[in-house]
Design a protein with these regions (language model features):
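Soluble FAD-dependent oxygen oxidases
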Residues: 1-190
C-alpha cells in the first residue's frame, strides 16, 4: 500500500528560463545545490525545443528553445522560508526570465503540461537514471537538446531531469513497487 502526504491545496511555484549559452552554468549550479535541498522542495529541469505560452513566459520567448528550471515549495506557500527558497533557486545562473506564484497543486501543477501533452496524443518517453549529474553528463544533455531532439525541425520534444529526492528516497526499493530509488537523477526524453 502507498502512503499519501497531505499538503496544499496550494503551493509556491517558481520557474527560470535559460538560453543555450547560459544553460550549462545553470545546470551545474542545479546539480551542486539539489542534493542538499530539504524534503519539501522539488526542483526539476525541462529542456524544451519550443517553449509554450505559459503564464510566466514573456511573449518574445514563446516558441524558442529554452531550458526551464522549475521549483516547488511543498509547504506553507506564504511562509518566509518558502518565499526565500524559491527566490534563491530562481537566482541560479543568468536566466532570460523568471516567474513565481502561488498556484493550486491539483489544477495548477498537475495540469501544467496538459496543453503540450493533450489526451489522445501518442507520446513516447524513454528514461535513464544517473547517480551523478557530472559536467560530462550536463554537456551531453545540453548538446543533445541543442543539436538533436528535433533541433532545426518542427518536431517538438522535451528532455527532462527530475531529481528524485525527498521522502521518495527515504523508502527502500524493496519496500515498494517503485524502483530505482537509489538513483538521484532521472532523465526523461519525450
Amino acid at each position: 500500500s502507498f502512503q499519501a502526504y497531505d499538503f496544499g491545496p496550494t503551493m509556491r511555484f517558481g520557474a527560470a528560463l535559460y538560453h543555450e549559452d547560459e544553460a550549462r552554468a545553470a545546470l551545474r549550479e542545479y546539480a551542486a545545490i539539489y542534493p542538499s535541498l530539504p524534503n519539501n522542495v522539488g526542483w526539476h529541469v525541462a529542456m524544451k525545443r519550443a517553449m509554450p505560452a505559459l503564464p510566466f513566459v514573456p511573449e518574445e520567448l514563446v516558441g524558442t528553445p529554452l531550458v526551464m528550471l522549475f521549483c516547488m515549495w511543498l509547504d506553507d506557500p506564504e511562509s518566509q522560508e518558502g518565499i526565500e527558497m524559491v527566490e534563491r533557486l530562481l537566482a541560479v545562473g543568468e536566466p532570460a526570465a523568471t516567474g513565481s506564484a502561488v498556484i493550486p497543486f491539483g489544477l495548477g501543477m498537475q495540469r501544467f503540461l496538459d496543453a503540450e501533452f493533450p489526451d489522445g496524443l501518442r507520446n513516447y518517453t524513454k528514461e535513464a537514471h544517473l547517480k551523478e549529474l557530472s559536467e560530462g553528463a550536463i554537456d551531453a544533455l545540453v548538446d543533445f537538446w541543442a543539436e538533436g531532439l528535433g533541433a532545426g525541425t518542427s518536431i517538438e520534444g522535451e528532455l527532462a531531469s527530475d531529481g528524485l529526492g525527498g521522502v521518495a528516497r527515504d523508502v527502500a526499493e524493496i519496500e515498494s513497487a517503485f524502483a530505482n530509488r537509489d538513483t538521484l537523477w532521472w532523465i526523461n526524453c519525450a
